[in-house]
């Protein structure tokens, strides 16, 4: 996990992100106000998915999905995505030559699959098109809409790094063992700076590198990030990148 985080939350990415953050902050904050998802979380997903817009993929989406449609393992899924991509073209949101992305059919600056585009993409700038390739207002609002619909709890943290008491039962560090941060505090879970833990009604202790590595207390919004990409290392990277874009610490 640390090799992944070293790349995902590298000093270079943080520096680039802080520069780009100042450019898009008003748009991110508008999306945050509308959907209740923190602006820094939106910026962090943008950073993770396309390195703040510098790498959105260059493969024509229709071609990528048509090719995958002949892959026996994912053929049915790819055909569903291909039909969704054709509906996007039919709607006039994007021209075919601009519909580019990854080899797996993910598109735009925050890498939406076509079915997710149809369900969650937003025309935030009011130009009549949902443009997640070129309009940062649309990119950030669409990402916020996805997270809000996935269950993001407004006003609640994704989680934080914590210290565990020496006698903490690491067997309780399990995604299925959930309770309030207050109850975790009673078991010896402490914030890194000694302040009170944030209110997390349904939190779990997460040890991404095992009992000897850093510990995190993660809440419902961490699980929402897994709806965007179902890898705990990804969700942790988004949370840590958001924290550092806001001037906070990395892993201590």
Predicted regions and their residues:
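Non-transmembrane alpha-helical segments in soluble domains
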Residues: 86, 144-148, 239
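Substrate-binding/catalytic groove segments of enzymes
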Residues: 124-127, 149-157, 191, 214-215, ...
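C-terminal soluble interaction/assembly domains
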Residues: 162-252
